[in-house]
């Protein structure tokens, strides 16, 4: 009987040992199967795709917005230029100075519109943003000045059809040379470059007009205005040209 109890005791002890061994074995197996890589569970394609593109949804959206802004700005700029060229058709008045002023007013108005459009579509270059604001302020003042000069010259009754003929010949040649500027020619990658590229050509047109009138006007105020336009806009042409070179 004692021997039988010993057998039962030994059997129970062996059973307990076996159970303990099974528990340790199960725990060890679970530890070995636990993923150590924080990226475990993600496919190779997902990981490599993220590393390769280096883009995020937010950056992709920003790029799309920039592209939309550029497209919209260029479309608006082309329309501004088309309207300007139509408005700059000058009917002879008998005075070259008046003809010059009547052509330069819509030219200035389009420069203001281009600057407002640039600011609206989110230009980021601080130097160009300040230039756009300066153009709006300066050329708004010059438009007021030109309207006053047209009134004063008209009241004086001064006519010189020979000089007017010479000026209009130069004016028509200048208009022909600038007739297709902007349309489908932009190589800009963003709104900043598009504005600088377009305004540079626009300024050159104003400089050409102003240089032309100097040969055909006897009006001191018109001469001063033309010289002011030449000096200011040639300086801004150099400024925009430098900005475009830095962007290359």
Regions found by a protein language model. Name each.
Residues 2-16:
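N-terminal Sec-pathway targeting helices
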Residues 7-9, 20-30:
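Juxtamembrane cytosolic interface motif at the C-terminal end of transmembrane helices
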Residues 25-248:
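All-alpha RGS (Regulator of G-protein Signaling) helical domain and cognate RGS-like helical scaffolds
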């Amino acid at each position: 009987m004692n021997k039988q109890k010993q057998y039962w005791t030994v059997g129970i002890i062996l059973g307990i040992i076996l159970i303990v061994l099974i528990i340790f074995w199960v725990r060890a197996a679970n530890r070995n199967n636990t993923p150590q890589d924080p990226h475990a569970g993600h496919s190779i394609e997902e990981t490599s795709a993220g590393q390769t593109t280096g883009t995020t949804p937010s950056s992709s959206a920003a790029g799309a917005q920039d592209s939309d802004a550029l497209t919209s700005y260029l479309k608006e700029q082309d329309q501004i230029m088309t309207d300007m060229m139509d408005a700059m058709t000058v009917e002879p008045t008998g005075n070259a100075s008046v003809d010059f002023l009547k052509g330069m007013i819509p030219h200035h108005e389009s420069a203001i519109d281009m600057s407002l459009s640039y600011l609206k579509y989110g230009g980021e270059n601080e130097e160009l943003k300040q230039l756009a604001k300066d153009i709006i302020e300066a050329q708004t003042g010059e438009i007021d000045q030109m309207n006053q000069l047209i009134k004063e010259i008209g009241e004086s009754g001064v006519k010189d059809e020979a000089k007017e003929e010479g000026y209009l010949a130069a004016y028509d040649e200048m208009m022909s040379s600038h007739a297709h500027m902007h349309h489908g020619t932009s190589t800009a990658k963003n709104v900043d470059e598009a504005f600088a590229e377009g305004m540079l050509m626009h300024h050159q047109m104003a400089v050409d007009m102003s240089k032309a009138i100097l040969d055909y006007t006897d009006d001191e105020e018109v001469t001063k205005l033309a010289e002011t336009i030449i000096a200011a806009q040639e300086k801004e042409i150099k400024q925009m040209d430098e900005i475009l070179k830095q962007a290359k």
